[in-house]
Design a protein with these regions (language model features):
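Glycan-association/targeting regions that enable binding to alpha-glucans and other polysaccharides
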Residues: 1-112
């Protein structure tokens, strides 16, 4: 479950798209550090695990995540002093939807 301290800029995340995550959790609110990272992977086994340093802002920490394939994206936050925000050891989880290929067709008459 998400808390009021984590926001994303899309209603749903999809394969092969990116999204921005805004973190305002205790690592930000307690001002413990200037360096916060988001660690993430796909599925229960954290396939293709990656980590990004988040950019500080007055609103929280920001990162853009390029979504790969999997059923869900699991992620946690950490700082450079060994403090973690991992949703009480449950991780934060977002379901991933398959990419939606949009095709646009025109009649031959419209192409002339």
């Amino acid at each position: 479950d998400f808390t009021k301290d984590i926001y994303i800029n899309k209603d749903k995340i999809r394969e092969d798209e990116d999204f921005v995550i805004l973190y305002k959790g205790f690592l930000f609110s307690n001002n413990l550090t200037n360096d916060v990272y988001v660690s993430y992977g796909y599925g229960d086994t954290w396939k293709n695990k990656d980590e990004k340093k988040m950019k500080p802002s007055t609103f929280g920490y920001l990162a853009t995540i390029d979504v790969g394939s999997g059923d869900n994206l699991q992620f946690v936050f950490r700082d450079n002093q060994g403090n973690w925000d991992n949703n009480n050891s449950q991780n934060y989880i977002l379901p991933i939807e398959e990419s939606q290929e949009v095709l646009s067709f025109k009649t031959i008459a419209e192409r002339s």
